[in-house]
């Protein structure tokens, strides 16, 4: 189901969509407005939007820091004032939420134990999905082979230009296939890097789905790269915050 200002989708298990007794994932669009989140800031627009999407569930979030930190929780209060980039849970009354603006939202569901969650995965956090799955195995007794993974809309290698040092890092630590070179420039596929990491971990290939939509190409998404492209290069990230649209991404029963 899609709305005017958000999209939703299903998980896939052995290549088949899960419907009925399964959660779905969702992501706000640029038209929904800025969904940025910090513990010391009030964002009434975000609160109203997520309250409507939650339909009675409790929204749980962490302040993002581009890390590999994932929390396994059973209540909203466990996350108070915490920073990190992922939330997993078995509690169907919770709706884990992260924010993205070109970075990859990753949605998880393990149908055997009912574990689900949401992750924020930029280039620094590439591989956080593996950390989350291992944490779910340790905490909830999950099996990595049962995990369904959806990589949501994010900046693709058509637009994600990186420097040579970062290109080499990804070639060595993930797979050479995740970097392409064109006219002396390097472009990164976050999808290829994360898929490689998941397959190496033992997640089934036909349980992995990746969105084909590039947030930098498509005007319906907020995009740090696209929306800040014309700003002075010496402007700080904090100053740039007002110029790009942060989106919310969630999983909900």
For every predicted segment, state its role.
Residues 1-253:
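Active-site microenvironment for binding and transforming phosphate-containing groups
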């Amino acid at each position: 189901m899609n709305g005017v200002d958000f999209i939703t989708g299903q998980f896939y298990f052995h290549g088949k969509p899960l419907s009925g007794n399964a959660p779905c994932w969702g992501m706000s669009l640029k038209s929904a407005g800025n969904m940025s989140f910090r513990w010391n800031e009030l964002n009434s627009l975000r609160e109203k939007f997520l309250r409507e999407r939650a339909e009675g569930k409790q929204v749980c979030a962490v302040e993002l820091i581009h890390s590999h930190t994932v929390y396994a929780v059973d209540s909203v209060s466990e996350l108070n004032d915490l920073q990190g980039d992922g939330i997993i849970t078995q509690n169907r009354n919770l709706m884990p939420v992260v924010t993205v603006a070109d970075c990859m939202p990753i949605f998880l569901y393990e149908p055997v134990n009912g574990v689900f969650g949401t992750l924020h995965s930029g280039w620094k956090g590439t591989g956080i999905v593996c950390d989350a799955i291992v944490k779910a195995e340790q905490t909830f007794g999950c099996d990595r082979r049962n995990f369904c993974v959806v990589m949501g809309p994010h900046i693709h290698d058509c637009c994600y230009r990186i420097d040579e040092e970062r290109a080499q890092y990804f070639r060595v630590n993930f797979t050479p296939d995740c970097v392409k070179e064109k006219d002396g420039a390097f472009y990164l596929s976050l999808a290829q890097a994360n898929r490689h990491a998941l397959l190496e971990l033992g997640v089934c290939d036909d349980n992995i789905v990746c969105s084909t939509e590039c947030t930098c190409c498509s005007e319906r998404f907020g995009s740090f790269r696209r929306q800040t492209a014309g700003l002075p290069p010496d402007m700080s990230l904090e100053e740039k915050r007002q110029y790009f649209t942060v989106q919310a991404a969630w999983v909900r029963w």
